[in-house]
Swiss-Prot record:
Gene that this sequence comes from: tco89
InterPro entries: TORC1_cplx_su_TCO89
Summary of subunit composition and partner proteins: The target of rapamycin complex 1 (TORC1) is composed of at least mip1, pop3/wat1, tco89, toc1 and tor2.
Protein name: Target of rapamycin complex 1 subunit tco89
Keyword Phosphoprotein in annotation: yes
Amino acid sequence: MERPSLSRRTSSSTVSTDGEGVYSRSTKERKRNFIVNSRLKRGGGHVRVNRSGRLGSVTMRPSALTRAHSQNPNSSLVNNSSAVSHLTKQRSLNDLHELNGPKHVAKNGLIPLTQRKPNCVWDDAPVDNDSTAGNLDSDSALPTPSVTTNEAADSSRASSPVTRVVAVHDNKKKIINSNISNAPPFNNTDVQASARPPAAGQDDSAADASTTKSSPVHNEVMAEPLPHSNNREVTQATNQPKWQIHSGSDIASEPPTLSRGNSLSLLANRKVPSTNVKKSQAELYDLGSSTSRTQQKLLIQRASSKFDIVEDDMDTNPSKRFSNPHTKHIMDLVRTQYRNVLRTRELIPEFLEKIRSSYSNNQNFDSQNAFNTSAAGTAGTREETISNGQNGIVASAETSKKDDGVQSASLNASMSARSHARQRSIHVPKTRKDTDYESIHQKLLQLWSQG
C-alpha cells in the first residue's frame, strides 16, 4: 500500500503550463510570496519602532535586535567627551548606508537590525538591559579585600572601619553613612586619609585596597537621577556630580563636558518622530534610503510641485514640458473642445441662413423635417451664402437685400410661418450625451449638401 505524499497538490485550475509544459507557480503561492517579500523589504511598523515583533525569537535578549547598547546608562563614564560628535554623525542615513554597504541595501532593501547599532558601542562595558539599567554592580562597587603582612597596618585598619569615598551631594551623605555600621560622621579628614598615598611599609596590594578601585565602568560614582524638566533654574553645579576618582594623584581636576543626563537626552532625541521631515533633498530623493509613509507623501508632493513648475513654463523643451502624462491628455481634450466650438460658430450662421431661405421660398413647409426643401428654391442664393458663410449673418443679410421682391415675400412668409409654428412646433431630434461632435458636424454638412 503506497503512502500518500505529504506535498499538497494544487488544483488544475490554478496551475498553468507554458508552451513546453513548464510548471508555473499557482496564484495562491504567488500572492503569498508577494505579500511576504513586500513586507520584508518595506519593513513593517515593528521594524521602524525598533521592536523585534514577529521577526525575532521571544527568547532573544533585547540587545540583539534593538539599540540597547546605546541605552547604557554608564555611557558617559566609559566614553570620553567626544561621544557627542559620534552621536551627531550617526543621525544621518548616509552613515547607516556606509555601515552596511550600498550593495547590501540594494539587494535586500532592508537594513539589518543587528547592524543598526551606532559606531560608539561600548564593547568593554557589560551590556545592561532594561531591567538592570541604572543599577550599580554590587560586586564591582565593593572594594577588594586586602591581604597584608604588616600587622601594624591591619590593627590600624581594624580599629577604624573602611568608608567608601563617593563624591555625592550633601543630601545623600546621610543615607550612605547610615548604611555603614559604626561609621563616624562624614568629614574631610576621612577623604584626605583615604586619598593619602600608602605608608612606606605597605605593599602594592595594600595600596590598591586603600584607594578603593572599582570596575572601569562605574568608577565609584553613584547613579544620579536625571534632572527634571521643571528644575531648569537649578545651577549647573548642583546638577552635575563631582567627577572625582580617588586614585591617589590621578584626581580629576575638571569634569568632562558630557554628563549622564546629557548623553541620555541625546540618545532619546535620535528617536524623535519629527526627524523625518527635517531631511535634505538629497536624502529625500535617495531611493535606497528606508522611507516611512510620511516621507513618501512628502516626496510625492515635492515631485508633483516640480511637475507643475515645468508645465507652467512655456519656454521649456516641449518634449519635456509634459512630464505628467495626465496633463497632456487634459490639454488635448481642451484643444479638441475648442476646435469644436470654432466649427460650431462657423456652422450656426450657415444653418440659420438655410432655414431663412427655406421660409422665404417654400410655403408648404414640412414641420416634421426642416431640411427637406426644394432644390429650385435655394439654387439662387446658395453660392452667395457659401461664399459669404465666413462672414456670418451680416454677409447673408446683404445678399438678401439685392432683391427687394424676394425680401418682402420672405418677410410675409416668415410672419405667416410664425403664426403656424405656434400651433405646430418644429421637430428637432435630440442628441444623446455620448454623441460625438464630429458625427454631428458630418451630419449637418451632409444635409447642407443635399439641400
